[in-house]
């Protein structure tokens, strides 16, 4: 559990020209995933500021969450047409953006970039499937050439789609940023069972919780970890039993005072859930 304390972090926006680690320290943490959706920030000057500021703050950047240009609609109606590198209309521009973020990530010294690939087709004989695999492979190979991994954030795909896609990409540096809430909120799987299918590829966890969809067009609701359907004590136990040693990045998709309260509560809960794991015979 002492080890877990050094692996709990938050999502931290890339702001202030790269000098942006005060929020991490405010929670008493030493780890974050840095995130930006503005690829114009992917400059050497900002990267060097990030590296210096992180070193000064004593914060480790677990990975860089790489947002991409163009529209993003987080539902089941427009989502397949707008999210990730699945939509052909945005694919080339987004692959290029991910490569720029990979250069940025290599310069700041973080091990991986993360993104949502989108609603990858369930049917592997769909003519749209192979080009998506090729695009993921292009980004993954670019990352590999720079000593980076490419982590796909779970959510818009079933676990078996993720598995077969990783197998087909075949670059050896693909992992998962495992967001258990997204599997539930998108209605794509039970996260605890999903580890049977993709557990070997889990590199980072988003500590997020949510409910299953109750409308055919909209995602389920996101809630504070412990209040949704993830069953965190069981998930933490299964991950640790499988030998997971990565980071636990808390994500609470609200803003203001309640977000801060919820994050502080989740830090305490994570330590408690992990301690319960330690005390078992």
Language model features with spans:
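C-terminal helical cap(s) of enzyme catalytic domains, especially alpha/beta-barrels
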Residues: 259-278
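Catalytic domains of carbohydrate-active enzymes, especially glycoside hydrolases
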Residues: 14-38
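Glycine-rich, proline-tolerant flexible connector loops at the mouths of alpha/beta enzymes
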Residues: 33-54, 117-124
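Active-site acidic/histidine proton-transfer and metal-coordination neighborhood
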Residues: 18-22, 73-175, 280
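Acidic (Asp/Glu)-rich catalytic clusters
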Residues: 21-27, 44-65, 100-109, 141-145, ...
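Active-site beta-loop-alpha junctions enriched in small/polar residues
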Residues: 11-15, 35-37, 66-69, 118-120, ...
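Hydrophobic faces of well-ordered beta-strands that scaffold small-molecule active sites
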Residues: 6-12, 32-34, 61-66, 113-115, ...
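Acidic/histidine-rich catalytic cores of soluble enzymes
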Residues: 31-32, 64, 133-229
